[in-house]
């Protein structure tokens, strides 16, 4: 889909507490490694039949924010249609407060910057 896997992995580290799922709104059994569908406290978010489908949905959702290009594979992201396509072409704009379009993946301030800090730390290992 043209989305960087390292960015998706860093996002998954953020959303799952480095895959411990401590403090995460999602559980391992959901195969949801990005908090997809968690729109407020207490909401468990989307579930996927396999880890592969969960990761594909995450990549597709990131593409929805980053681009207006068509998907290359069948859509498995139930929330794809809710995204204003191309509204966050930069990782830094994934947080709604930082996005000049007022849109984004997460409402928390600095969301995209947190993803990039995790990625930087991984690359420095």
Language model features with spans:
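Catalytic cores of secreted/periplasmic lytic hydrolases that degrade extracellular macromolecules
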Residues: 1-125
């Amino acid at each position: 889909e043209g989305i960087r896997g390292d960015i998706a992995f860093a996002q998954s580290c953020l959303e799952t507490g480095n895959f411990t799922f401590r403090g995460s709104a999602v559980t391992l059994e959901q195969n949801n490694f990005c908090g997809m569908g968690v729109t407020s406290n207490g909401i468990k978010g989307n579930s996927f039949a396999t880890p592969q489908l969960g990761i594909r949905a995450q990549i597709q959702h990131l593409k929805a924010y980053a681009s207006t290009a068509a998907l290359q594979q069948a859509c498995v992201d139930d929330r794809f249609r809710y995204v204003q396509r191309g509204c966050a072409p930069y990782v830094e704009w994934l947080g709604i407060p930082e996005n000049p379009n007022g849109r984004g993946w997460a409402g928390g301030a600095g969301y995209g910057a947190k993803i990039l800090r995790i990625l930087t730390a991984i690359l420095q290992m």
